[in-house]
Regions:
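C-terminal ends of transmembrane helices
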Residues: 5-11, 62-77, 114-125, 206-215
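A generic, well-ordered mixed alpha/beta core segment in the N-terminal half of proteins
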Residues: 85-156
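Short, amphipathic, aromatic/basic-enriched membrane-interface segments that mark the entry/exit
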Residues: 14-20, 70-82, 100-101, 189-197, ...
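Short hydrophobic alpha-helical membrane-embedded segments
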Residues: 20-28, 79-89, 106-111, 182-183, ...
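Structural signature of hydrophobic alpha-helical transmembrane segments
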Residues: 47-61, 100-109, 192-201
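Long hydrophobic alpha-helical segments that form multi-pass transmembrane helix bundles
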Residues: 125-205
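Hydrophobic core segments of alpha-helical transmembrane domains in multi-pass membrane transport
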Residues: 27-37, 58-66, 93-95, 111-115, ...
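N-terminal signal-anchor module of multipass membrane proteins
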Residues: 1-63, 67-70
Length: 223
């Protein structure tokens, strides 16, 4: 009997980590650009620019934190940044905060997300918590009152949870709720304020389907 030995992986997949993260990053940026366009048309250029500024703050903070970590660990900074995919965490975190969040709150949240929730656990693929979710938790606990005064309106999720306890009692109540946000069309198209990346639901669903078809994500997880 003849045995053949070869190094792992024994099962190969054409989907590389680099490709998966690049396509995911592109998808997230599509959502971000759509949000910027909405805020520019509905709330003016200052709101749109603030969205871009929040993303820039998160990205710069991410690269600074990961560069310092790479230096401390005596790793090549450029190689580490390319393989750490920290920008994905920065984009997701930015999409999870409201447009009226202050920049310094996003910077602090990014430090917690990158350093405490990711790098200290070993970096990409080793963290036990979602870094962006940790950053959002920091904002919710420590910076809920910090904003720049662009938007103060309640989002649909907060209204339906606090007012209707997630279940409108009848059709009239449901119509009253929907009218605040332009009906089902308004909810689908995201024509209301909220977290930067949460409102354009129809676009998010379309991107999710595309990513599932391309096998970038497993459709069973979001479903």
């Amino acid at each position: 009997m003849k045995f053949t030995f070869h190094v792992s992986p024994s099962i190969k997949n054409n989907l590389s980590t680099q490709r998966i993260m690049k396509e995911l990053s592109l998808s997230l940026l599509v959502v971000f650009v759509a949000a910027v366009i909405y805020y520019a048309s509905a709330w003016g250029a200052s709101a749109a620019l603030h969205c871009v500024l929040l993303l820039a703050c998160s990205l710069i903070t991410t690269f600074v934190c990961e560069s310092i970590f790479a230096k401390i660990m005596k790793k090549d900074v450029k190689t580490f940044l390319k393989s750490s995919f920290g920008w994905v965490t920065a984009i997701i975190l930015t999409l999870m905060v409201p447009v009226n969040m202050s920049c310094y709150a996003v910077i602090i949240a990014t430090v917690f997300a990158i350093v405490l929730a990711k790098l200290l656990f070993g970096g990409f693929g080793q963290n036990i918590f979602n870094p962006a979710a940790v950053g959002r938790a920091v904002i919710l606990q420590a910076f809920t009152g910090v904003s720049v005064g662009l938007i103060t309106q309640a989002t649909p999720t907060t209204v339906i949870a606090s007012t209707y306890h997630w279940l409108p009692s009848n059709a009239a109540v449901l119509d009253s709720f929907l009218s605040q946000y332009g009906g089902f069309a308004g909810l689908a198209l995201g024509t209301y304020p909220g977290s930067i990346g949460e409102t354009f639901s129809i676009l998010i669903l379309i991107i999710g389907v595309v990513l599932a078809i391309r096998q970038i994500i497993d459709w069973r997880v979001p479903v």
